[in-house]
Structures are given as C-alpha cells and as structure tokens.
From Swiss-Prot:
Gene for this chain: hemL1
Catalytically driven reaction(s): (S)-4-amino-5-oxopentanoate = 5-aminolevulinate
Modified residues (N6-(pyridoxal phosphate)lysine): 268
Localization per record: Cytoplasm
Native organism: Bacillus mycoides (strain KBAB4) (Bacillus weihenstephanensis)
Name this polypeptide is given: Glutamate-1-semialdehyde 2,1-aminomutase 1
Superkingdom as given in the UniProt entry: Bacteria
GO BP terms in the entry: protoporphyrinogen IX biosynthetic process
C-alpha cells in the first residue's frame, strides 16, 4: 500500500498539533514508530484513508462504533438533531428518553446523570463516592485505565500495602497517595490492602471485564468477593463500564456477570460515536449530586441534543434481534481462524475473547492480569500490526488493545481477515 499522503499529513500535523495526534494512542510509537494512517471516510465495517486505501476496521474508534461507521439510523438521528439546534443549555425530552432507556437496560441504575466523556463519568463517581462515605482514598486494579484525570493516573506502589505513585508528569504525589493499586484477579492482595487501608477507602474502581490491557475476564467468584470485602470495609464499588456496557449484551457487563455495583460509569458505545458519558447508581448515593446534594457536577455540553439523539438511535439498533448473537458468532470464527493460522505457521499466541471482542497476545502464557499482559512480545506485535496494515486490516496500534467487531462485519470480512493473518504470520515466521 502507498501511504504518501498520510505521511505528508502527519509531517504537517507535527507542526501544529502536539505530537501530531490528539490522543497518544493514535501515535505509532508503541508499534515501532512511523506515520499513523490518516482516515478520510468510514462506512460500515470499512475505512478509506487519504491515499484511497481500503481497510476492514477492527479499531471501531477503540470501541464506540459497535454499529459500524455512518450507520444510517444513527446518522439520520444526528442530522435531525443538528437541524433543530445542537446545544440548548436547557432540559430536553431527549435526555429523559435516553435516561429511561439506560435504566431499563441496566437495573442497577436508579438514577443517572449525563456528562461528556468516560473520563468525566469516572471522575464524578469518585467525587460522589467520597461525598457519600466521607472518605478520600480510592482503590483500583493495576493496568486498568479509567481516564486521564489526576485522580486515576496512578501507578502501583511497591506492593498492595503501599500507596500509589504518579503515572504521569503533572500528577501531584499528594493525589497519588490517595490511590491504592492492586493486581486484578487476586483476592489475597485485595484483602491485604483493605486490611491496612479499608477504613479510609471511599470506593474501588472495577472494570468488570478488563478492556485496557486486552480482554481479560474475572476469575469465577472474583467480582463477588470484591463486593463482599469492599462492602465489609464500608466502601462503595464503582464499575467502570465505559468499554463494556452494551458491548457484550444489551446492558452492562454487570448484568452479564450477575454482580451489582453501587455506582456505574458509562461512555463510548452509548453515544453512538458522539462525545458522551453518563454515571448512575443507587438512589441514596446519587442524591449526593447537586442540586439535591453537596457533590457538585455540571457541564455546558452535558445532555446536548445531538449526543442524546445519537445515543438513543444507537441503542435502538442494538435492541434488534440477533445483534449480539451475530457478534459472538463472528468473534468465535475469527478466534478459531487466528489460532489455526498460528499453529500452521508456528507462531506463539494467546487469544482472549469474549463474544465480539478479542485480544491477540504474542505469548504462550495465560493472561489474567496486567503483569502477564505487560510481559508479552510488543516488538512482535508491532511487526504484526504493520503487516496487517499492508493487508488492509486496521487494528489498534498497541499490544494491549482489543479487536472490536461491529454489527456491520460479515463472514466474508472475517474470512479475508483470517487469510491476512495467515500471510502476516508467514512473514513473521520467515523473519524469526
């Protein structure tokens, strides 16, 4: 493939935009460098870049585009909203309708509030939990990303009984000291941390199914134990379902797994591709939020008609019969084909899949926590990523990210992708 225009555009972008990208995950730094491909148009499961190259897209904008690009039902809803004015600064019927849809889909949401991003929704659930409990410390699991606010850009300390350290320049040590990080899927270290800090903990942040170091499911009974131990300590359980809500079923991962949190943060899929976030939970906790309570949260763009209309339309598409069964069927087909090609070409991989999302790790080890994901072969993934790009397959440029299927992918797309994987694995095998 020819990437001349993408390369020229990136060179120009570097003169005007920091790092040439508006989110570091779009850079090719994690896959060996080079100019990221600039896309010009998306339709269904496909992308076309500025050079005219066509791709089957498994990035799906890191998850939100579950109905494919430019879905006609969603596009019509956005267009209608735009024609009626995109921002009012007043209540609307659309926000009430959308809130009711979310509550019906996720029974743990007694009350909801709309914001503008997943980062905002997580940030606000933390504030609400602190207001409700009167405590300040937060717990999270290593490797789980909860947005770019100072509150959660925190790395693990030297052990579960130590406090966190900043995971970004500009995050004060004093804020990091309010966060305790423990390994995912490890009850003993969670218990050890709670034994020491539990009386100061306001809440624990949980990705019920991890999406930020690949697709990693909880061990049987792990989430139930988290609820038990955290509630015993007098703290709240917050589920970050920014990636997982409406991805695996119509509703949340909490409903798929049968475990109920106190608060839930939402984003990505629920906006149908437009900026959005939402949070909700138990009535008595949510009533801490202004104007009813002392926990302040506001937003000029929150609940804007365009995002509400897009979100409603997206959920209407996902309500249709057979949507999630199709995603699961295609996901299973893709996983099987990738594993067969790996065996054929003697490439060591592990695939973690849940329904229509999967991650390919270059390792033979089981991936159940961040340390295991971190120790996979990133150099091999980088080579694989660029080989797949040449084959017309668009993946996330990071070994940690998932492949996301959409309602618009077809069996023919999967068959071609498996063939492309085979050619990429053959090239990797030739250059071991």
């Amino acid at each position: 493939m020819n990437f001349t225009k993408s390369e020229a555009l990136h060179k120009e972008a570097l003169e005007h935009i920091v790092g040439g990208v508006n989110s570091p995950s779009r850079s090719f730094k994690a896959v060996g460098g080079g100019s990221p491909v600039a896309m010009e148009r998306g339709k269904g499961a496909y992308f076309w870049d500025v050079d005219g190259n066509k791709y089957i897209d498994y990035l799906a904008a890191y998850g939100p585009i579950i109905t494919g690009h430019a879905h006609p039902h969603i596009t019509k809803a956005i267009t209608t909203a735009a024609e009626n004015g995109v921002l009012y600064g007043t209540p609307t019927a659309l926000e009430v309708k959308f809130a009711k849809m979310l509550k019906e889909a996720m029974p743990a949401l007694d009350k909801v509030r709309f914001v503008n991003s997943g980062t905002e929704s997580v940030m606000t659930t933390i504030r609400v939990a602190r207001a409700y409990t009167g405590r300040t410390k937060i717990m999270k699991f290593a490797g789980c990303y909860h947005g770019h606010s100072d509150l959660v850009l925190v790395a693990a300390g030297s052990g579960p009984s130590t406090l966190g350290t900043p995971d970004s320049a500009g995050v004060p040590q004093s804020i990091a000291q309010e966060v305790i990080t423990v390994p995912f899927n490890n009850v003993e270290t969670l218990k050890e941390a709670l034994d020491k800090w539990g009386h100061e903990v306001a809440a624990i942040l949980v990705e019920p199914i991890v999406g930020n170091f690949g697709i990693v499911e909880p061990k049987p009974g792990f989430l139930e134990k988290v609820n038990e131990l955290v509630h015993e300590a007098g703290a709240l359980v917050i589920y970050d379902e920014v990636i997982t809500a409406f991805r695996f079923m119509y509703g949340g991962a909490q409903d798929l797994l049968g475990v109920t949190p106190d608060l839930t943060a939402l984003g990505k899929v629920i906006g149908g591709g437009l900026p959005i976030g939402a949070y909700g939970g138990k009535k008595e906790i949510m009533e801490q939020v202004a104007p009813l309570g002392p926990a302040y949260q506001a937003g000029t763009m929150a609940g804007n008609p365009a995002s509400m209309a897009s979100g409603i339309a997206c959920l209407e598409v996902l309500q249709q019969k057979g949507v999630y069964e199709k995603l699961d069927e295609l996901g299973a087909m893709l996983e099987k084909g990738i594993l067969e090609q790996a065996t054929k070409h003697n490439i060591d991989i592990t695939v973690n899949r849940l329904k229509g999302a999967l991650t390919v790790y270059f390792t033979t080890n089981t991936i159940e926590d961040y340390d295991a994901a971190k120790n996979t072969d990133g150099e091999m993934f980088g080579r694989f990523f660029k080989l797949m790009l040449q084959e017309g397959i668009n993946l996330a440029p990071s070994k940690y990210e998932a492949w996301f299927l959409t309602t618009e992918h077809t069996k023919e797309d999967i068959e071609y992708t498996i063939e492309a994987v085979g050619r990429a694995f053959a090239a990797l095998a030739d250059n071991k």
